[in-house]
Amino acid sequence: MASDDSVPQHSVEKTTEYESSDRGLFDFMKKEEKDETKVIATEFEEKVQVSEPEPKYEDCKVVEEEEEKAAKPSLLEKLHRSGSSSSSSSSDEEVEEGGEKKKKKEKKGLKEKIEEKIHHKEEDTSVPVEVVTEPEKKKGFMEKIKEKLPGGGKKVEEETVAPPPPPAAAPVDCAVEGDPAKKGILEKIKEKIPGYHPKTSTEEEKKDNDCASAKLIIRCLDRMFDYYYYASFSCGVGLILCFDPLLWGPLISFGTSG
């Protein structure tokens, strides 16, 4: 029985050894694969680093400046923050405590305090202006005497009273040929000239009468000249006949024959 038990024990040990040796081989192969992948990855990274260009010094400076600007808050942002903080502090805040509302005291900002001080200074500097009525000027000795004289006070009153405005000149109706409402440019200019008086209907009638009388006189003068001419001609002929006896014979014969 003892020999039988020993045989299977040896067989079991052998199987375990083979299994362990097989596993060791597979594990070794797996490790080698891992090492190969690591080597390939490192080579690829080195190639990529070599192919990429090195960053320039100027580009680095620009990037640093932009980062600094972004980090530093601008003046407008600071003012906006200060204004928002002052407004939030000055605003009324209501807090409920046990169902009751209580208002916190207003915290005034710097701007409001400065404005209040300025207003106070302006109020202090403003001086109340008093309206002073000027007393009447002192009258001289002569003026007092004139007032006491009869008629002196009336003159003063007359001087103070303003004279009435002059009456408006009445519009002059001008008789114009054709439509009386329509006037020519020359007539309007003549009306504006000082000392010009537009012609009325009576003046025009007088002019017509004067023209007619002048025509009659001219006609009378023409007739008088005609008579004078004939008379002078006849007188001349008579004188010629008186002083020229040669013409007497034919005239006498002409008279007797007739």
From Swiss-Prot:
Q: Which organism is it from?
A: Daucus carota
GO BP, one annotated term:
cold acclimation
Under InterPro entries, the record lists: Dehydrin (IPR000167), Dehydrin_CS (IPR030513)
Region (Disordered): which ranges? 1-25, 46-131, 148-175
On induction, the UniProt comment says:
By stress compounds such as sucrose, sodium chloride, calcium chloride and abscisic acid in shoot apices.
Query: What domain of life does the UniProt record list for this protein's source?
Result: Eukaryota
User: How is the polypeptide modified once translated?
Assistant: Phosphorylated in embryogenic and somatic embryos. Not phosphorylated in non-embryogenic cells.
Q: Could you tell me where the Basic and acidic residues compositional bias lies?
A: 11-25, 46-80, 109-124, 148-158
The entry's protein name is Phosphoprotein ECPP44
Give a GO cellular-component term: cytosol
What does the UniProt keyword field contain?
Phosphoprotein, Stress response
Q: What is the recorded function of this protein according to its Swiss-Prot or TrEMBL entry?
A: Phosphorylation of ECCP44 protein is thought to be involved in the acquisition of embryogenic competence. Unlike other dehydrins, it is not thought to function as an environmental stress tolerant.
- What family name appears in the similarity comment? Belongs to the plant dehydrin family.
Task: Name the PROSITE patterns for this protein.
Answer: DEHYDRIN_1, DEHYDRIN_2
